[in-house]
């Protein structure tokens, strides 16, 4: 089967390699022994390969894409990944709320995950076209989905400017966008208390695990690949702490 390599996820000294078959099937390519590949694997993002593989005997949801790779033959590098992908799959489009069936929850540090409690999606990989920028955090390891609401289509670049508008237009609440601009959100009250309450802006993020160096901003409308990490919980966690699959960004096209 012809397979486009769409991701190489960093895993210490190994790589979790993702592929998209010519029939639109999403694959997580494991070695014939069921392990992740070495960093020296010749399977590189953007390359087309002719692969022979078989599904593993037993998978643990949501990681239904696991296959055992038996043979590989290089085919081509003259592939346009975005075009290839969009011809075969229908990506999620719009808000981050739409990915993985809306089952993603977020930690206090704004990192997305799923758990048995929140519900397990029917897959662990997917493509997404976000309606807002994804901005790199200062840690250089996570991206945040930058929600922007323009209910009335008015922008304000300073709090004072926004507050003056709120005073002149009773019933307007003001909330700050992550990039520092102010937007009118909805009609409720013009009080200072309401303005202060709306001063916070919840971020929702995901870890970047691709090999390519991260960029500061992935613009809205960019096709990106998402995945859910294997089930995990910290070794030093409480006995009743739930296992989770954390949300990851594999790359963009």
Predicted segments with their positions:
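Nucleic-acid-binding small beta-barrel platforms of the OB/S1 family
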Residues: 1, 56, 80-253
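N-terminal ordered "arm"
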Residues: 1-54
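Generic "edge-of-domain/loop-turn" microfeature
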Residues: 10, 24-26, 58, 74, ...
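Surface-exposed beta-strand edges and their flanking turn/coil or helix-capping segments
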Residues: 32, 42-44, 64-66, 239-240
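Generic alpha-helical propensity signal that fires on short helical segments
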Residues: 46, 67-69, 87
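Short, Lys/Arg- and Gly-enriched loop/turn segments at beta-strand edges
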Residues: 56-69
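Short, charged amphipathic alpha-helical surface segments
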Residues: 71-81
């Amino acid at each position: 089967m012809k397979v486009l390599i769409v991701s190489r996820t960093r895993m210490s000294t190994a790589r979790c390699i993702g592929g998209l078959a010519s029939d639109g099937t999403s694959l997580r390519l494991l070695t014939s022994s069921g392990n992740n590949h070495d960093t020296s694997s010749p399977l590189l993002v953007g390359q087309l390969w002719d692969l022979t593989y078989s599904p593993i005997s037993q998978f643990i949801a949501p990681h239904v894409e696991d296959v055992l790779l038996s043979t590989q033959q290089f085919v081509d590098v003259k592939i346009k990944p975005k075009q290839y992908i969009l011809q075969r799959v229908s990506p999620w489009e719009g808000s981050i709320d739409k990915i993985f069936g809306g089952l993603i929850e977020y930690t206090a540090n704004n990192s997305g995950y799923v758990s048995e409690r929140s519900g397990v999606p029917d897959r662990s990989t997917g493509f997404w076209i976000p309606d807002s920028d994804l901005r790199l955090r200062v840690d250089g390891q996570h991206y945040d989905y930058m929600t922007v609401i323009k209910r009335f289509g008015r922008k304000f670049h300073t709090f004072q400017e926004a507050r003056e508008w709120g005073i002149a237009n009773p019933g307007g609440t003001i909330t700050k966008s992550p990039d520092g601009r102010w937007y009118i959100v909805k009609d409720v009250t013009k009080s200072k208390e309401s303005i202060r309450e709306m001063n916070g802006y919840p971020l929702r993020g995901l870890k970047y695990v691709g090999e390519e160096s991260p960029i500061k901003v992935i613009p809205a409308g960019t096709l990106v690949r998402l995945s859910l990490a294997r089930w995990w919980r910290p070794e030093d966690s409480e006995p009743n702490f739930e296992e989770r699959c954390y949300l990851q960004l594999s790359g963009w096209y």
